[in-house]
Each structure stands twice: as C-alpha cells, then as structure tokens.
C-alpha cells in the first residue's frame, strides 16, 4: 500500500487565488489558456448593452449628420487634431485629403468599420486602443501612448484623427489630455474649449477622473520636478552664509596701511619695530600710537572674515553646526623703517 501526498497544481492554485478575490455574484471569471480575466457585473452588462445599441445609435448619428448642419462627423479642435465619430471606409480618402497621417481608434473590434490594412494603403498610421463604450475610460498607459502618438505627428506637421463611436467621450478624453500637457491648459479649460468647438462632447465620470489623474501625474508632477531641479542649481552655501552666526564681509571695511601713513613717526629702532599678534579673534598691537593699533586691528578682522568665508565655501555640502570656528595663532611683525 502506497500513500501519496496530493499537492495543488499551479493552475489549481491560480484558480483558488482568483476565487478568494472574487465576491459571489459580483464578478464573472473567464479562464482561457491559463489567463484569468475578471469582469465586474457592471462592465459585463454595459458590454452587452453597448453591442446591442451600437448599430441603432450609429444610424441615429448618421441621420442627424445628414439633417443637421451643426451635427458634424468630425471637427478640427487643434491645428493637427481632428476629433470625430467612427469613420466609414468611404471617409478614408477624404481624411487623407485633410492631411490625416495618423488615426487613433478607441473602439472595440465590433465597433471598428475600417480595417488597419485600408489605412495602411493610404499611408496612414493606425493606433488601436480598444476601450469599452459609455462608462469607461482608457488606461493611463493607453492615454500616454495616444498623447505621444498625437504629439509625434504634430511635431512633423501631420494631422491625427482621434475617434470613438460618436466622438463624445472616449476620444475626447484623449484630446483633452493632449491639450493639458502640450497646450498648457487646465482640464476645465480644455474641456470647455473642446465643447465650444464640438458642443455634443460629454465625459462620463470615469473619463473625467482619468483626465484629472493624467493632469496631476503627467503635468503637475513634471512642473514640480522642474521646480526641484531649478532649486538644486542654487548652491547650498548661499543659504548657509545668509544664516547662522556668519557675518557678511564688507570689502569697504578694509583699511590698507601705506608708507605715507607711517611718515612722521620716530625712526628709533626700539620704537619703530612693533610686534602684532593675532590669537583667535583677539589682536594685540605693541604700538604707542592708538590710531596705528586701530588700523592694524581692522585689517586683521577683515582678513579673518575673508578666510572664514573661504573656509565655509569649501564645506558647502555640510550643514553649519553653530560651533565657533577656531583658527590657529597668527603672528604678524610690522617693521617701520
């Protein structure tokens, strides 16, 4: 009799992990070739509804486009950006005439009416970002990819056509994100600007949330990094010298003793040789003339201040500790002849 311990396979572990994270009745789990896809009930229901309503709403938009002059299929919202509804194969030549060299499709496969091969035959680059209709927004990664696609074409003078089914929500999300990053607009200003050109645009809550998140992550964070980089260019010692116990040195306080200042003094060797000693911050002058002592003391203080500033400059990466700066004794002999 052999007893064999049963262990879970990797697939069983994966399924059990998914089951632990899925609430009963709230999510549907699809397992295909080892890939586990978790769908919320809301997403599944919206997907079914979107499929059922695609062609009826498409016909509705076509009829309004034919009857109402203000209900345009696409609008030029920027010099190199067209925002509009899903194009038909017959629209591709006209888009090419308008200078379109790139198309961003935010439709799911069942909503796409023009294959990539047709765009390619007209030398039009095609970027597909499949996004569910109505209540959903593209991911942050997809938005960044689309914005870069538009910016790259615009820098080359090429126009990009951004579309979803009706040109209202998903495609508008991409266009607004481009405007806030490359046209220096706030989300509110960009939204109002696009609506002034294409009045029927309308963002769902998730789409507006994606715009605001993109603005904070890609725009405000970039500006913050630029501010930090600018502040980093300011040497630390500039802030340090202006604070603490450091005295700013004034070149005007320096007094230079020249030979003419010494004229008239006794040439006797016993009185002409004066010894000056500087120890720390104290300067002693062995001179009978009080004015001579004052002049030499000012020069000594000026020299001490300049040496202190030079020493602090070498320690720009260290924070001032507030300790007194100590220097060795300096002996200065001034001989008057």
From Swiss-Prot:
Keywords: Hydrolase, Lipid biosynthesis, Lipid metabolism, Phospholipid biosynthesis, Phospholipid metabolism, Protein phosphatase. The keyword Transmembrane does not apply. GO terms for biological process: phosphatidylglycerol biosynthetic process; root development. Disruption phenotype: No visible phenotype in the double mutant ptpmt1-1 ptpmt2-1. But plants lacking PTPMT1, PTPMT2 and PGPP1 have strongly shorter roots associated with a defective order of columella cells in the root apices, with stronger effect than in the single mutant pgpp1-1. Expressed in stems, roots, flowers, mature seeds and leaves. Belongs to the protein-tyrosine phosphatase family. Non-receptor class dual specificity subfamily. This is Phosphatidylglycerophosphate phosphatase PTPMT1.
């Amino acid at each position: 009799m052999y007893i064999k311990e049963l262990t879970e396979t990797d697939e069983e572990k994966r399924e059990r992990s998914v089951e632990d994270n899925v609430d009963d009745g709230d999510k549907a789990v699809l397992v295909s070739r080892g890939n586990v896809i978790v769908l919320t009930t809301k997403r599944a229901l919206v997907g079914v509804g979107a499929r059922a309503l695609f062609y009826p709403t498409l016909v509705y938009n076509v009829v309004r486009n034919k009857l109402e002059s203000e209900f345009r299929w696409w609008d030029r919202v920027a010099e190199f950006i067209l925002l509009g509804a899903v194009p038909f194969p017959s629209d591709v030549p006209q888009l090419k005439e308008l200078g379109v060299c790139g198309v961003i499709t935010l439709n799911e496969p069942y909503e796409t009416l023009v294959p990539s091969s047709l765009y390619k035959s007209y030398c039009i680059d095609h970027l597909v970002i499949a996004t569910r209709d109505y209540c959903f927004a593209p991911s942050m990664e997809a938005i960044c990819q689309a914005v870069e696609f538009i910016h790259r074409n615009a820098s080359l003078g090429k126009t990009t056509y951004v579309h979803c089914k009706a040109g209202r929500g998903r495609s508008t999300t991409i266009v607004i994100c481009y405007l806030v990053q490359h046209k220096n607009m706030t989300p509110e200003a960009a939204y109002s600007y696009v609506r002034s050109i294409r009045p029927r645009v309308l963002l769902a809550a998730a789409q507006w949330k994606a715009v605001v998140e993109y603005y904070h992550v890609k725009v405000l964070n970039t500006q913050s990094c630029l501010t930090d980089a600018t502040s980093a260019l300011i040497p630390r010692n500039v802030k340090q010298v202006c604070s603490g116990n450091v005295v700013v040195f004034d070149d005007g306080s320096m007094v230079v003793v020249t030979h003419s200042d010494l004229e008239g003094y006794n040439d006797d060797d016993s009185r002409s040789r004066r010894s000056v000693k500087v120890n720390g911050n104290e300067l002693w002058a062995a001179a009978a003339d009080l004015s001579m002592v004052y002049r030499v003391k000012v020069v000594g203080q000026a020299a001490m201040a300049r040496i202190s500033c030079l020493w602090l400059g070498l320690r720009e990466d260290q924070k001032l500790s507030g300790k007194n700066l100590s220097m060795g004794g300096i002996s200065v002999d001034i001989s008057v002849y």
